[in-house]
Amino acid sequence: MAEDDMCSLFFKLKVEDVTCSDDPEKHMKNASNERKPLIEPVENQLMDIDDEGGSVDHGLLYLYVDCRTMMCCFHRGSLPYNWMQGALLTNLPPYQHDVTLDEVNRGLKQALGFFGYADPMRTPYFTAFSFPGRVIKLNEQMELTSTKGKCLKFDLYASTHLRFKPDELVRHGECKFAIG
């Protein structure tokens, strides 16, 4: 019962002006559009990336966990240790309508080797982050089967730096995967 109360608070949670998304697709696209001027150079503008070591922006990355873990992340300002080498994130958007939550759990369990993702209630919530230059793109990908039988591939990213800055948190909310 206490967890239900805590999860209802999750939807009212506001972290550094970031509120829960009731329409993740619209909010993710808006967030991406808001960030474009920050990461794309203006025409004829020179950029000196050598000083930064060639920082790469991977776009929005998503973390899928249960409500209690998500609340702890926000409270502590750190990512959960959900992988043997730190935190694992993906570019699978939480509004992917042709993938079921069970299939996402299967893909995460396979990618992470983490038994907790066998329970579909482990990933109904997402947090979207923007980590330019702070994550490593892994060689392997998460392979999912769509509701139409099509093979879909999503990139996986790792972060050993688990603390996050408030401005790296873009959105959070409940996933809108296909029901199946």
Curated annotation (Swiss-Prot):
Keywords: Cytokinin biosynthesis, Glycosidase, Hydrolase. InterPro entries: Glyco_hydro_41, Glycosidase. Pfam families: RolB_RolC (PF02027). Its EC number is 3.2.1.-. One of its GO terms (molecular function) is beta-glucosidase activity. This is Cytokinin-beta-glucosidase 2. The keyword DNA damage does not apply. It comes from the Eukaryota. Hydrolyzes cytokinin glucosides thus liberating free cytokinins. The keyword Cell inner membrane does not apply. It comes from Linaria vulgaris (Toadflax). GO terms for biological process: carbohydrate metabolic process; cytokinin biosynthetic process. The lineage of its organism: Eukaryota, Viridiplantae, Streptophyta, Embryophyta, Tracheophyta.
